[in-house]
């Protein structure tokens, strides 16, 4: 169930403050964050966030298509190593 339009998108205020400080800078720094729950706002476009996945910070460059999604969607927390592959030498003919 989506969030109410009346309430607006959720975002941590400290992220918006950091983005607005870097707005006019030529060399933008990576913004390190643990806030996976924050919605990506249009003001975040063009910035790089290092989103924590529980182990390391993964750099995420924000583009227009990401607006409206959550930061955590672009920083996977689980690693998929694949299913076991059967050894073809052992198979009976």
Swiss-Prot record:
InterPro entries: Ribosomal_uS19, Ribosomal_uS19_bac-type, Ribosomal_uS19_CS, Ribosomal_uS19_SF. The keyword Transferase does not apply. The keyword Membrane does not apply. Residues 73-93 are annotated as: Disordered. GO terms for cellular component: cytoplasm; small ribosomal subunit. Disulfide bonds: none annotated. PROSITE patterns: RIBOSOMAL_S19. One of its GO terms (biological process) is ribosomal small subunit assembly. One of its GO terms (molecular function) is rRNA binding. Keywords: Ribonucleoprotein, Ribosomal protein, RNA-binding, rRNA-binding. It comes from the Bacteria. Belongs to the universal ribosomal protein uS19 family. NCBIfam families: rpsS_bact. Protein S19 forms a complex with S13 that binds strongly to the 16S ribosomal RNA. This is Small ribosomal subunit protein uS19. The lineage of its organism: Bacteria, Bacillati, Mycoplasmatota, Mollicutes, Acholeplasmatales. The gene is rpsS.
